[in-house]
Amino acid sequence: MDRNNPTTSRLISILTFGSLFPILFFRITDPQGTIFWFYSVLMTGFIILTYVMTKGYVPKPDVGYRPEVSVIIPAKDEEEAIEETLARVFRADYPVSKLEVIAVDDGSTDRTWDRLQKVRNRLGVGDRLTLIRNAGNKGKRAAMAIGVRKARGEILVCIDSDSFVDRDAIKLLVQPFTDPTVVGVCGHGAAANTDEGVLPKLQHYWYQVMFRIFKGMESRFASVTCCSGLLSAYRRNMVLAVLDDWLNQTFMGRPMLIGDDRELTNLVLKGTEGKFVRSSSDGRLIPVLPLSARDAKVVYQSNAVAYTIVPTKLPEFLRQQLRWKRSHIHGCINASKFMWRKPLPAAASFYLYQFLVYMSTIVSVIWLVVRPLQGDALSGLVFLAGNMYVAFLSGLNVWKLSKAPKEAIPYTVGFVFISVFLSLTVLIYGWLTPWKGGWITRTAQGTNPWEETLSHPTPLIRANLSGESNPTP
């Protein structure tokens, strides 16, 4: 099957739009399944909208734009990956005179700091690499803020300490900033360790769906709701303007220690009307370009690629997913307060998607737990079959749009079972414990070193744009 053949495109379209007919048939043959039917119609409509919109997505090509860039890399216990992360950045196809790198060791307990010093000497980059070491672990958000305050570039590029960028990723990532209303850009993510088992490969193709399909759709509306930490970029002045708000976010009266990337995206996507930054030279407050929530744009660049190390063991994967589910809850609540100001297509797709995410858990419980316990096991099989069909369509579209190999289709279908399991377990637990947080993916045996901080909150950090962070009085 040729992905570029018009017949292939028509076949995928027929399979996508044709998914409405089984739903209508189910409604006729099972009039009692109103909830399932209503949910299925909305979900199918959203999926069709997503495929139609993402099909027309095109990344911005390289037009020669080369602003001054500051790359910020917060690191916590990444001795195995940090050298390669930095080496990839310094091998980037970007003018040396316009690229600085700031790495912040956030209280690592392994040899991360030694590796940072080693790579600076090995690469011979001198003062192009600034190394900062926190005496103790303060969290990713605080580490990133330190880098933001030290940065001199017009554009901030944020990269996770276990992510590896393509040689042309940075130059392609900054191209959308030629539009002055673009405040943030999300790069494309993929798994770096697909050779380490089935679980990493499942995640790799799930990333392709979430990035190329869903972020591609959001980018058509210029409203990408989460710039992934593995590769993203922001205008520095925009981040400085919201830095205090970001550092001092709370949830249920506690400092927010998760969802750093999603919340930063929210703050710049909300617009910068009435925001100021303080001049480092004379201390004057300078107004930032006043963008309303309707005008501020966050987009996706599928051609700017970074590869990240994904979990290889199920317990590690589940801890990561729990952190992500909790951050999604926080981010959804905060984004819901302003997304209605966006153009109608962006607002409608956002609220519909959030409704479907939470509705999916309720529907999963009813059709996979309640109805089988009532003796109706067929309903559970029908529900799983529907999810597998949707995943099959996602795999087809990833194969066609991302030029992925054909194995993308079965792996995407296979991830359905993990997704359903997450809806029935991790997502529900995240709902019940949304106040908990921390980089629990990196914590041994599921413990959380932030628990003491959560139980006894320290004074919130107030950003001093011309110096170090100081506790609020």
Please place each PLM-identified region on the residue numbering:
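Flexible internal linker/loop segments at domain or repeat junctions
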Residues: C332-Y353
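Alpha-helical transmembrane segments
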Residues: R10-L20
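Non-transmembrane catalytic domains and loops of membrane-associated enzymes and transporters
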Residues: V63-M339, R462, N470-T472
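Short linear elements at protein peripheries
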Residues: S228, R236, I440-P473
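Membrane-proximal soluble regions of multi-pass membrane proteins
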Residues: E316-R326, G331, Y411-E451
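N-terminal membrane topogenic signal
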Residues: M1-I12
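Membrane-embedded multi-pass helical conduit in multi-pass membrane proteins
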Residues: P22-G56, P61-G64, F350-G437
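Cytosolic juxtamembrane regulatory segments of multi-pass membrane proteins
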Residues: V71-I82, S419-W431, P449-G467
